């Protein structure tokens, strides 16, 4: 059984523990509305996405104006983390992508920081990152479960190295990004 093997559970943050994408979607709607005389909403969204992607290595993920937005846990998150903590069986680690300052502030604002043994912020989540952390934690990947909304960056890498993935999809507007 999975629960008997797992020693460490990694949680993604944005759109797994709290809503984040909705704020980006709203900002994009305002952006395309303000600039509609220069192109269609699709053209403007594509241009914005390309610019954000190009800036990501330098500026990180997301606009700094989003640093003050709420990070309200989804229903059931606190109850789930409480239950996992009370078992005493698992080390809970928050591993998320993004800007270090932004993620640290969101975890603090969410009130969930008390549940996590460690908070790790990375720019990319993939096989290498999961292997590196499994070595630091002195736990084989076969004893790690990852809970996240992105199959590509949260779930697939851990499965490929023998761990467990718990996919919680989140697409508030049916988006694909």
Task: List each language-model region with its residue ranges.
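Short helix-capping segments at alpha-helix termini
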Residues: 36-41, 87, 111-115
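Short, flexible active-site loop motifs that bind/organize anionic cofactors or intermediates
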Residues: 14, 67, 93, 120, ...
